[in-house]
Amino acid sequence: MSNGKVALIILDGYGIGEPNAGNAIYMAKTPVMDSLLQRWPHTKLSASGLDVGLPDGQMGNSEVGHTNIGSGRVVFQDLPRITNAISDGSFFENPVYGAALDNAANGKALHILGLLSDGGVHSHIQHIFAMVKMAHDRGIERVYLHCFLDGRDVAPTSGAGYVSQLHDYCAELGTGKIATLQGRFYGMDRDKRWDRIEASYNAMVCGEGVQDPDPIHAMEASYAAGVTDEFVKPVVCAADGKIRSGDSVIFMNFRPDRAREMTYALTQSDFDGFARKVVAQDLHYVCTTRYDEKLTDLPIAFPPEELHDTLGEIVSAHGLRQLRIAETEKYAHVTFFFNGGTETQYPGEDRVLIPSPREFPTYDLVPEMSAVKVKDELVARIRTGAYDMIVCNFANCDMVGHTGVMPAAIQAVECVDRCLGEVVAAAEEMGYTLLVTADHGNADRMVEPDGSTNTAHTTNLVPLVLVGRELPLRAQGRLSDIAPTMLELMHIEPKPAMTGESLIEKS
């Protein structure tokens, strides 16, 4: 019998793609992963669509993936939850949204913020359309849209099409005006790069930035200058569209991590990320979902559904020690999301945050990111033998995959493979069973069949390799099956709420 110590290694963005020149994982030299697949039991997991609580065919993402992995169940995600509310009409009766619109009806403006795409990772354009319609139906006269352009979860120059759709929809209803445009690089930072948030804030609150009353022309001008959607510099399209004291602001993003910093800048009196030239006081500000447990003063339109009896909670309840480790870009995923969307740190749960490199604007310039530091700390912690369960994330294949730069993505994959080799050696030395897997695909499709760049996640299956135990695995599973598998390896019974099924074949 094994000692019951288990380590889960999540290779973020490491999907199983077609064996072609557009697949950075296939093109990379991966002797460690190759040898693991030859030597140890392995299977494939679904990490997208209905299998992770997303709409059918919708690509998975890190938040969704880690929530499903850590909770051991398929978790109905915010995207279909909100989309279903639009379909059944309850969205338009939402009392939190309604209160913000009531405020705007009393002589104030309504500002709708959000990532303008159908990528479905942080937002969905149909949710923004629904909010414009709700404002129209309630007779709100001054409705301004502050659009963050995507180019990351969708094609890099698809933004012009989304802007055109929104522009036409507003014209058709006679409600809504695009006030500002900007790449998500600015308004949706999550790593305290406050200069980016400041540029975004100054466009929306102060009216500062490129001045262009025609949003379609602004997009064309950006493309002509070689700047794709994600990096479009803040553009002011409506001089009268500034966010002013007392206005209503609704942030339509449902994923918290990239909505948090802008929300702090717009709403918190003690905000100190940068010196605000103008502070819009007493905003009626609505978060579509819970962006941060500390933001207790802000109403939430779709509050979280509580998840109990997650993997971390069960392991802690058995008096066992666990470790969560990742670099900044994925730290929230192995802690907050893995624990079911709560900041709770369980008894016996240690956390290690390795800073992501901040001196580079994009990760194709540093494809190794902080993987070696993560690996070094992880190996040192494994060698203590102190932990019964370890969860580690290597961010590279996802974060470098998002840049669309193929040579850098190959370097990222190879760096992760080298790190994995040292982790496997340490785990074998200390008697740990390893589960090596991914939360979704990304680097497995860097180039589309037509030759264009892909910067988004994929819907491909992801690998799961069981290292250290010769146990037969089911032919295919889904991410929610990982937690019950780990509990079985640790000789712990899962709770009834954990509806995933162990991947280990019953003899």
Residues covered by each model-derived region:
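Feature captures the catalytic ectodomains and active-site-proximal regions of enzymes
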Residues: 1-507
